[in-house]
Amino acid sequence: AYPHWWYGDTGKVKPFGQKDNGGDLVETAFIMQALLSVHQYYIDGSPAEQALAARIDKLWREVDWNFYRQNGQNVLYWHWSPEYGWEMNFPVHGYNECLIMYILAAASPTHGVPAAVYHEGWAQNGAIVDPHKVENIELHLRYQGTEAGPLFWAQYSFLGLDPIGLKDEYCANYFDEMRNLTLVNRAYCVRNPKHYKGFGPDCWGLTASYSVNGYAAHAPNERDDQGVISPTAALSSIVYTPEQSLQVMRHLYEMGDKVFGPYGFYDAFSETDNWYPQRYLAIDQGPIAVMLENYRSGLLWKLFMSHPDVQKGLKELGFSTVSKLSLIHIS
């Protein structure tokens, strides 16, 4: 698996934390989701494009998902280090941003995991199902450590994975669930219980981003709300809440160069603290472009869902979909 960070000029690992200096299976899943989409885009292209697709296929086949079961357990672990081994000790349970990791682990043609790893590890034998209301909006999944997580939980797994009509035994419709998670985030910001300046229907969206106090995972609860709006939160939600997200986009654009620069909207800001850092974070910028295109044409969803290994993995885990966008019907 790939590390969370590495130096582009040397290929050496840049530690994400003291003991997080090795493989990161979640970040590996995110890049593989992207690469499999690129593979499908180029697979029938020119000789050079087909050669690139072949290189991607080699990278895909080399990821050892099964190793991250830590001696054959029916759960996937987030980290492994050549120096510290399994000391990070982070078994991944749902729901959070990591759904795609379990799907790709089942989809791997070379180092795949059995369906029991998903059902016992991610879904914890059904404990992931937890019907509850937040901001008077219905949610049906258990969110790790909170009643409703930050918005990247509704986005990262679904940059390529098409949520429309996607279901399994734990969730009747992933699109509806993620839309409701987004609406919870918006409703919390509109209610604005901590009375931050600027929050409202035109300015909402809590997710992981820079903040006044460093990088933080902002979420719709008073503990995790620091008054920081991250444009990626609402903009990358455009597939779920097009009207509400466009309302935020127009408002942010009208705010001018305090929040908008040469590469689009800056990562985060706080009107309460008069904090406008004017800096970018790639993992926040990227989903904006991807989700805008998925909203416009469904392109990335179509590409990813068309990969035969992805279809195999979804089927093995018991997923079905009737999405008209992806044109792939799995039952």
What is the predicted function of each stretch?
Residues 1-327:
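Ser/Thr/Asn(+Pro)-rich, low-complexity disordered segments
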